[in-house]
């Protein structure tokens, strides 16, 4: 174990789903034989964190729980079986904290589908604390010297949308429509799509979000509160429909609409998780147009490495708002109102 590790730390914890989010002193966890102990400097805040707190997904959380799964910090200790890491390395805590590494899914690099997957901020205390543990195999390697506040959202939001774009099977010059284009996921999806050579159409609401979309390099913006017919407008703007659609919004209706404006032989990718939602697609339309509808979960270790590399080369940058960890409850309030533009990051020292 390294020196100067305190016994207690500041963190945000809740004891029942939907209960009070308490900013308080809690114990510093001890790393297991296969784990790193990471001094978390910054953590992104994801919509999944809100679901974990509310407990409204069909997967139960551990309780009590420290949320968060976009933690960026410095390795300060490690278990005796850890290899390939050293004290002082920059490391990231991802949604997938650990997996069995021996099942069919892990063997095929689909670790997120592992039946024994351990999830940061859900089944494993996450990054809304100053010190957190992560399986050394799954922890993300971050180049030393990286701005940890800016890289934090890449660890989930960035990896997730990058994997989704890969799942759309697009080629340079193709149109990709991003539903929810100016939120935490969408704002990164726009940049990854541009960096991958795609033409980007964004769907969201409001002048502030339209400006952000354009500032990020998006080509055509549709305000869903003003458009009279979104499918028709997408088809007209793209001269035939989007080759791929990335659904990061939490609107069941938006998902249904996307099956109507995707191009023949195109792919609709589902990422956002509206509560109790169903994906509705006209079977005749889907068959005759040869449309694919796929779900895209989080990326694997290779996707993570590639997503961070895009960031390190300056090709993507999360539009972030940095506030103190103690302000987390107010961020959740903004999330529930749909009032967030870009991505919130919490500073664990405040």
UniProtKB/Swiss-Prot annotation:
What GO cellular component term, any one, is given?
Answer: cytoplasm
Q: Which GO terms describe its molecular function?
A: alcohol dehydrogenase (NAD+) activity; zinc ion binding
Task: Indicate where this protein is primarily found.
Answer: cytoplasm
**E.C. numbers:** 1.1.1.1
Any idea which UniProt keywords this protein has?
Cytoplasm, Metal-binding, NAD, Oxidoreductase, Zinc
**Bound cofactor: record note:** Binds 2 Zn(2+) ions per subunit.
- So where does Zn(2+) 2 get bound? 100, 103, 106, 114
Enzymatic reactions: a primary alcohol + NAD(+) = an aldehyde + NADH + H(+); a secondary alcohol + NAD(+) = a ketone + NADH + H(+)
Which cell locations does it reside in? Cytoplasm
Q: Which cofactor does it need?
A: Zn(2+)
Output the SUPFAM superfamilies linked to this UniProt entry. GroES-like, NAD(P)-binding Rossmann-fold domains
**Of which family is this protein a member?**
Belongs to the zinc-containing alcohol dehydrogenase family.
Q: What is this protein called?
A: Alcohol dehydrogenase 1
Q: Which organism is it from?
A: Kluyveromyces lactis (strain ATCC 8585 / CBS 2359 / DSM 70799 / NBRC 1267 / NRRL Y-1140 / WM37)
